[in-house]
């Protein structure tokens, strides 16, 4: 498959004739391009192993697509939706997600890499993201409520005011993450590590902990 630029050059015609022109965008590539208002679900079901570097996506929809192992490093997503999208082992390193309509909740993203990305205030509620990497991310006021984040790595992330209520955080790593004002009410924190993490104002009501849960020595919760 060639570049998605070739496929999307005349998006209106492509969507209008989607039954005849339904395409497989696996292994497609784009570099430094802008995509606006595209509902990729009307074009394809597959974007596995695709590679989009330094791209801008505005008001695009990726609902239910198979995007496993795809790379979107150094890209920007404005008001984009990933409802039920399969993002296992995908990479969004150093990328930005913003806008009131941006949505990653209910996405399936095992071991997805968001290292150095900006996900501030993004809705990731009910996402399935065990083993995913949020290392040094901006997660200010991000919504992770009800998500499966077992074994996820939040090292050095700025997660002030983030919502982890009811989340599965067993074995998660919060080393040096800024968690001031974060809400862990009802979260499963068995085996989670909070070493050297600021926790001022964080809420842990009804959170589940065990002997393997590691909290900074100054916090007696």
Give the label of every model feature segment.
Residues 3-221:
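Tandem repeat scaffolds
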């Amino acid at each position: 498959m060639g570049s998605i630029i070739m496929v999307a050059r005349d998006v209106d015609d492509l969507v209008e004739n989607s039954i005849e022109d339904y395409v497989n965008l696996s292994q497609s590539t784009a570099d430094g391009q802008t995509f606006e208002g595209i509902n990729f679900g009307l074009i394809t079901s597959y974007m596995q192993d695709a590679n989009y570097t330094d791209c801008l996506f505005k008001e695009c929809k990726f609902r239910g697509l198979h995007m496993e192992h795809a790379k979107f490093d150094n890209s920007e997503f404005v008001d984009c939706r990933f409802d039920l999208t399969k993002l296992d082992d995908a990479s969004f390193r150093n990328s930005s997600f913003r806008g009131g309509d941006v949505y990653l909740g209910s996405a399936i993203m095992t071991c997805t890499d968001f290292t150095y990305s900006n996900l501030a205030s993004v809705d990731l509620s009910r996402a399935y993201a065990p083993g995913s990497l949020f290392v040094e991310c901006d997660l200010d006021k991000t919504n992770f409520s009800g998500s499966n984040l077992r074994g996820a790595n939040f090292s050095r992330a700025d997660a002030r005011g983030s919502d982890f209520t009811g989340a599965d955080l067993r074995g998660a790593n919060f080393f040096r993450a800024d968690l001031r004002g974060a809400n862990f009410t009802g979260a499963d924190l068995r085996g989670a590590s909070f070493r050297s993490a600021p926790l001022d104002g964080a809420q842990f009501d009804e959170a589940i902990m065990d002997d393997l849960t590691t909290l900074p020595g100054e916090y007696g919760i």
